[in-house]
Amino acid sequence: MNPERSERIEIPVLPLRDVVVYPHMVIPLFVGREKSIRCLEAAMDHDKKIMLVAQKEASTDEPGVNDLFTVGTVASILQMLKLPDGTVKVLVEGLQRARISALSDNGEHFSAKAEYLESPTIDEREQEVLVRTAISQFEGYIKLNKKIPPEVLTSLNSIDDPARLADTIAAHMPLKLADKQSVLEMSDVNERLEYLMAMMESEIDLLQVEKRIRNRVKKQMEKSQREYYLNEQMKAIQKELGEMDDAPDENEALKRKIDAAKMPKEAKEKAEAELQKLKMMSPMSAEATVVRGYIDWMVQVPWNARSKVKKDLRQAQEILDTDHYGLERVKDRILEYLAVQSRVNKIKGPILCLVGPPGVGKTSLGQSIAKATGRKYVRMALGGVRDEAEIRGHRRTYIGSMPGKLIQKMAKVGVKNPLFLLDEIDKMSSDMRGDPASALLEVLDPEQNVAFSDHYLEVDYDLSDVMFVATSNSMNIPAPLLDRMEVIRLSGYTEDEKLNIAKRHLLPKQIERNALKKGELTVDDSAIIGIIRYYTREAGVRGLEREISKLCRKAVKQLLLDKSLKHIEINGDNLHDYLGVQRFDYGRADNENRVGQVTGLAWTEVGGDLLTIETACVPGKGKLTYTGSLGEVMQESIQAALTVVRARAEKLGINPDFYEKRDIHVHVPEGATPKDGPSAGIAMCTALVSCLTGNPVRADVAMTGEITLRGQVLPIGGLKEKLLAAHRGGIKTVLIPFENKRDLEEIPDNVIADLDIHPVKRIEEVLTLALQNEPSGMQVVTAK
């Protein structure tokens, strides 16, 4: 292309807002500013030539000399028309680029001295490649941008001038004002084409992204419209078939419930998927009933609802003290939990296991803990549970399947953080249907129960906010399960504790339950003590409550039969008239010291008890017989005790060959009751020595402890229960292993005061204290 000659001109200047006019471009302009209209009139008076220059800022109403770009387009006015509103419509055609060398404002309009821009010499082969590429790229751009009519491409192919081609492309591109001005200022055609190609590439990328987004939105709209249409069709069909009335749509109600349940993302997706399935089913089908039941359970389970937990320690302590007498260790543990909770907002609920004999208040204590902490109370009885599905639920493939009892109870209580009482956790068993104790491992593990998996729900459920309290009569709980719980032992009550419990709780409760009015019945302390001593022998207070209930019933009967009677007083003297013959003897069962008879102390699931051990020696051939339903451990204790006696036969004055000439029979009465355990060794040994030497055993002495072959006394468990049993039985002197001396701190003071407790290390000390006559020939070292 030959360079154009630079020509200087003087010409009126029309400022344009947001518009850049290129050469060969025909465009209508609406002019409203007075100064601009005068500029058009001046151009019409001369040769109809005018220079169109863009303003730097479109918002400037009255631009100055410095507010215009220096490069514009010289244009020819093709047509000018004045409109009724005072504005002027003018049709112009761009002719050539020009640069302003001097711009002036004569007060009427802008005027400029300008010179046409020249095009530099270029490589025509390179330009041809650029033209082809630009046309191809613009074709791709037009396909994506539906706003540009396809006819533009046809007219573009008919343009032979590369400069005009570039300007036409620029005119149809949605460029910013600065970019349009940059194109106008480029006199080099090749540079202009390259710049436009880069701009087209950027626009094509944006249009492709826009197209993808538009397609996605369109698909979603089509899907939702299709689903709406099909649902309406289905409703119409069902209505025609009589399967659906004009009642509110059940599916919509379920959808609202799902939204209101505030489920976690996984659970909500599962529930919504099941709801979609339900919509496709006939409402009367069996499968629809199953799905509907599943969704009902999903919305009933508390996913987010919590009850407000109390943080007032003093109030909690008052509630626990009012509801329960004693049980200080348990109360302290609950108060410790509340104290930590008051400082830490998110704390995992403790998992406590209350172990103790029946009737000591384990279950009622769970209710009191719930009351003290402000949690809702829910109880699950585990006695006799042997199916794992009771805990984890049944899979939905089974007919009549339901969630496990755990989830059912959570749905019933309606909050995520109740106090959950697992009652009688030691009474579970396993069979071919699984082991529920193993299923509870996940429930009672604070690290795992954040994602408890119920077979029916099929989604994880968070149990970490639940405060679990388990109850048990014994430690006969699987070791892994026991390891996950904090065990708190509840021993039996002392006589004083039972008296206070009866006066504070049991008697008022039974008076109210039997509809006795105030002042109609008085039960003296001596009567309550009489019931405790002569009519009950238990670790708890259930039997005591039954006897008090019996007193109340008899009192009501008396009052109704004898209208003149207004008040009944029961004391120790007339207790026999209401409860009949005394069932137990308080004090020693036997007042005489007897040969071969020893009082041992035993621990049972219902508390401690006195255990009588009898031994008899008869002429024979050294046969050893033991009766009384003794377990293997107790039988081994007898064997060990016999060896200890044989090793000390000479010192004890026993014929060394007694085991060859005499038969020995060891018997523990109440043969129907199985007995076992490792704490009767010293009692067995003492009974054997007494029998073989003829030295009577003191009747006021009871003992507990295992024995080794060297005569050492080993420690035992359940000391508190055993000492309480000795106290109840009227025993005065108790022999315990020396290593159990530290356990005496847990024994009530009144029991310690009433008993003469001797910690012993060796069998020699036991024999010295237990036998009526001190054994001869034995060196005794008293334990300190």
From Swiss-Prot:
| Lon N-terminal domain ranges (all copies) | 11-204
> What Pfam families does its record include?
AAA (PF00004), Lon_C (PF05362), Lon_lid (PF22667), LON_substr_bdg (PF02190)
Q: Which reaction does it catalyse?
A: Hydrolysis of proteins in presence of ATP
Q: Give the subcellular location.
A: Cytoplasm
> Reported effect of changing K362A?
Loss of proteolytic activity and ATP-binding. No increased persister cell formation
* Keywords in alphabetical order: ATP-binding, Cytoplasm, Hydrolase, Nucleotide-binding, Protease, Serine protease, Stress response
Main location group? cytoplasm
Please name the HAMAP family in this protein's record.
Answer: lon_bact
Main function: ATP-dependent serine protease that mediates the selective degradation of mutant and abnormal proteins as well as certain short-lived regulatory proteins, including some antitoxins. Required for cellular homeostasis and for survival from DNA damage and developmental changes induced by stress. Degrades polypeptides processively to yield small peptide fragments that are 5 to 10 amino acids long. Binds to DNA in a double-stranded, site-specific manner.
Q: Quote additional remarks.
A: Both its proteolytic and protein-activated ATPase activities are stimulated by DNA, especially single-stranded DNA.
Descriptive protein name? Lon protease
Instruction: Report the source organism.
Output: Escherichia coli (strain K12)
